[in-house]
Amino acid sequence: MKIYSRTVAVSLIVSFLLCFSAFAERNDGTFRVGLKKLKLDSKNRLAARVESKQEKPLRAYRLGDSGDADVVVLKNYLDAQYYGEIAIGTPPQKFTVVFDTGSSNLWVPSSKCYFSLACLLHPKYKSSRSSTYEKNGKAAAIHYGTGAIAGFFSNDAVTVGDLVVKDQEFIEATKEPGITFVVAKFDGILGLGFQEISVGKAAPVWYNMLKQGLIKEPVFSFWLNRNADEEEGGELVFGGVDPNHFKGKHTYVPVTQKGYWQFDMGDVLIGGAPTGFCESGCSAIADSGTSLLAGPTTIITMINHAIGAAGVVSQQCKTVVDQYGQTILDLLLSETQPKKICSQIGLCTFDGTRGVSMGIESVVDKENAKLSNGVGDAACSACEMAVVWIQSQLRQNMTQERILNYVNELCERLPSPMGESAVDCAQLSTMPTVSLTIGGKVFDLAPEEYVLKVGEGPVAQCISGFIALDVAPPRGPLWILGDVFMGKYHTVFDFGNEQVGFAEAA
């Protein structure tokens, strides 16, 4: 996913700046991109607030069967990213880019970008200075959750370390509106996703590496160093894996839909207790361009409640629980089909056959992804969340009074409009482990792994690494596993066998 014009304005925090450190070829035929990390200051969080000021706090998106590229529109690059250095042209013109497994195009600012502030603050590609430039001219545009770019395609040589990819199609960005790319520490983005979601169907750089025989094995892998005291930020390995980067064996799961590195995910556990949310299956995307771990509002609210994260009060949610909570509880006890409950009590206008959209709003215009402002949509989504929450508590044999009190508390923990939720830095030891089930194996995240620290000393803040993102069926429910997860687990992107592998990082 990257999640995009459907705007998930999340934006947090501490981030790792992945600058190009060193590229090296080894005897095993792999090429390594050394990564360095830098902490982001609070400017990006402020920028995100400005960018998202007019946006809705909670969103659900309906993506059609051909909506693969739509997820890109949700992407937000203002939280934390990994960067590296590449060059375009002959002689090489250097750019810092995000190595992003959640998108597939390469773009950098163009010298023909005259009126966007972002272009003035970053290096620009000058085709007239490259002897290997070939004119293309096809128009291109990409919309993100907190930003957009537009421009045209060109062809030129792209250098990644010692690898020179010939005749690579890329986008020269001539428009970068908004504040997102103004404050960004990177110049452009290098997508490592599948060609299926590439704007203009341009072959990704990774595809041409393989096609031109620059890489022996169709595999690349990420190791992200989460130790803030070490200078080395991590490593991106093209052509294989480094056994020193992980412990034990990888758990592999097949890619279920080419476009993103998407796979099936099982249940989510909080403190070892199943939530049941993904018992019937959820989809997940491994995304190096996202710092946090994003999931449906319903379950993210439960997680943030368990870790003591403070969000904003949703009056709509509390109103629904106050007026209909007991009715929902009674219907569940009478074994009414959960997906039909909200329509039965008149809060939803459908009977659940289209699938439950676990969010506060739903999008009916999939092409333009316009948000609905109807109060009815909000009440329907609040009802759907309440059904899931009450189900979860019934499985634990809680009393009716305790269940309704718990659901009211969850309403108060709904994420803030920024998507971020603060936690008490002094309470890490009391927070539960949060676990994801992938390929039948449980992958744990401890508090120190999912809580992100912004700033130092008395002004330091701790932020939950979980943010809400609602994608309606058939694409959703969808999870985005960003750096919070990939930092704990070394990740292998096996293009040849179309699978993703996870093992504990060393």
UniProtKB/Swiss-Prot annotation:
Optimum pH is 5.0-6.0 with insulin B chain as substrate and at 37 degrees Celsius. GO terms for cellular component: extracellular region; plant-type vacuole; plasmodesma; secretory vesicle; vacuole. SUPFAM superfamilies: Acid proteases (SSF50630), Saposin (SSF47862). Expressed in roots, leaves, stems, petals, carpels, seed pods and dry seeds. GO terms for biological process: lipid metabolic process; proteolysis. One of its GO terms (molecular function) is aspartic-type endopeptidase activity. Residues 1-24 form the signal peptide. This is Aspartic proteinase A1. It comes from Arabidopsis thaliana.
